[in-house]
Amino acid sequence: MDPFLVLLHSVSSSLSSSELTELKFLCLGRVGKRKLERVQSGLDLFSMLLEQNDLEPGHTELLRELLASLRRHDLLRRVDDFEAGAAAGAAPGEEDLCAAFNVICDNVGKDWRRLARQLKVSDTKIDSIEDRYPRNLTERVRESLRIWKNTEKENATVAHLVGALRSCQMNLVADLVQEVQQARDLQNRSGAMSPMSWNSDASTSEAS
């Protein structure tokens, strides 16, 4: 089964009936009332949102918004795990950004607006993020980073993030991002060298 559908099925099976009712209410502006009356599970609702392209594997913002409204941080973590897995199968730069995002989300607190502005996220979008995630600081940070990434596209790099953090005097967080990046680089180099080393050892054994 498609990994994104597996995620949605997992989320759906973890929702209570009252939470499903709340989700249906939150989606009134997106899904018609008659359609919502037919919804019997979270998966029914997610399927409708998929049909309307409101939900996609690469665009989980709405799913995050809905789960944040329910304060289901455990389910938000499943979305994080899904995105981390998707990044692992993507280009190395994408995987590096995902790792940097996790560090920043864990370590940037109430000063997230300053970082968002440094990344050229507009005040209008910052206000919108606050409205969507009134009680979830981590999701505010993550959403602002996502907006920056979608705007910058191929110009979105870890180096750019580190520079923005240092411009905001968030040097400790910048150091943490660089440490994680260096560890990843070392791991990647070790992984690339291992097969060569194995082949070298095998050749030596055969020669002896």
Swiss-Prot record:
Keywords: Apoptosis, Cytoplasm, Disease variant, Glycoprotein, Host-virus interaction, Immunity, Innate immunity, Phosphoprotein
InterPro entries in the cross-refs: DEATH-like_dom_sf, Death_dom, DED_dom, FADD, FADD_vert
CC terms in the record's Gene Ontology section: CD95 death-inducing signaling complex; cell body; cytoplasm; cytoplasmic side of plasma membrane; cytosol; death-inducing signaling complex; plasma membrane; ripoptosome
Consequence the record notes for mutating residue 175 to K: Strongly decreased interaction with FAS
GO molecular function: caspase binding; death effector domain binding; death receptor binding; identical protein binding; protease binding; protein-containing complex binding; protein-macromolecule adaptor activity; receptor serine/threonine kinase binding
Impact reported for residue 105 to W: In IEHDCM; reduced folding stability as measured by differential scanning calorimetry of the mutant protein; impairs interaction with FAS
Main location group: cytoplasm
Tissue expression: Expressed in a wide variety of tissues, except for peripheral blood mononuclear leukocytes.
Domain DED: 3-81
Phenotypic consequence of residue 176 to E: Decreased interaction with FAS
Glycosylation site list: 117
PTM statement from Swiss-Prot or TrEMBL: (Microbial infection) Glycosylated at Arg-117 by enteropathogenic E.coli protein NleB1, C.rodentium protein NleB and S.typhimurium protein Ssek1: arginine GlcNAcylation prevents recruitment of caspase-8 or caspase-10 to the activated Fas (CD95) or TNFR-1 receptors.
Region (Disordered): 187-208
GO biological process: apoptotic process; apoptotic signaling pathway; behavioral response to cocaine; cellular response to mechanical stimulus; death-inducing signaling complex assembly; defense response to virus; extrinsic apoptotic signaling pathway; extrinsic apoptotic signaling pathway in absence of ligand
Effect of residue 135 to E: Strongly decreased interaction with FAS
Quaternary structure annotation from Swiss-Prot or TrEMBL: Can self-associate. Component of the AIM2 PANoptosome complex, a multiprotein complex that drives inflammatory cell death (PANoptosis). Component of the death-induced signaling complex (DISC) composed of cell surface receptor FAS/CD95 or TNFRSF1A, adapter protein FADD and the CASP8 protease; recruitment of CASP8 to the complex is required for processing of CASP8 into the p18 and p10 subunits. Interacts (via death domain) with FAS (via death domain). (Microbial infection) Interacts with human papillomavirus 16/HPV16 protein E6.
Function: Apoptotic adapter molecule that recruits caspases CASP8 or CASP10 to the activated FAS/CD95 or TNFRSF1A/TNFR-1 receptors. The resulting aggregate called the death-inducing signaling complex (DISC) performs CASP8 proteolytic activation. Active CASP8 initiates the subsequent cascade of caspases mediating apoptosis. Involved in interferon-mediated antiviral immune response, playing a role in the positive regulation of interferon signaling.
UniProt-recorded name of the protein: FAS-associated death domain protein
Organism from which the protein derives: Homo sapiens
